[in-house]
């Protein structure tokens, strides 16, 4: 029997914390339509992602993918850094 290939979930967001070792916190923002009023409202989710080489910094725009659980709250991994934060 052929196994159906799973699609890997990927998300894009901004790094809001890099204080943990090999872990980043990524803020994912999305727009959803209010069920009654019809106005589009911003909703956000914070996810912990594995950053093996500690290469991300606050403000970077990154892509993460779902992976096996690495820790109690960490089941996403860094795929790519799309845009570096501007350093002052």
From Swiss-Prot:
Keywords: Ribonucleoprotein, Ribosomal protein, RNA-binding, rRNA-binding. GO terms for biological process: translation. GO terms for cellular component: cytosolic small ribosomal subunit. Pfam families: Ribosomal_S17 (PF00366). It comes from the Bacteria. GO terms for molecular function: rRNA binding; structural constituent of ribosome. Part of the 30S ribosomal subunit. One of the primary rRNA binding proteins, it binds specifically to the 5'-end of 16S ribosomal RNA. HAMAP family: Ribosomal_uS17_B (MF_01345_B). Belongs to the universal ribosomal protein uS17 family. This is Small ribosomal subunit protein uS17. The lineage of its organism: Bacteria, Pseudomonadati, Pseudomonadota, Gammaproteobacteria, Pseudomonadales. The gene is rpsQ.
């Amino acid at each position: 029997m052929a196994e159906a290939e799973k699609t890997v979930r990927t998300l894009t967001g901004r790094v809001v914390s890099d204080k943990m070792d090999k872990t980043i916190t990524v803020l994912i923002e999305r727009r959803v339509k209010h069920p009654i009023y019809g106005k589009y409202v911003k909703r956000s989710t914070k996810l912990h992602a594995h950053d093996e080489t500690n290469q991300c910094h606050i403000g970077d725009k990154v892509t993460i993918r779902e992976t096996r659980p690495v820790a109690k709250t960490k089941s996403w991994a860094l795929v790519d850094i799309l845009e570096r934060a501007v350093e002052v």
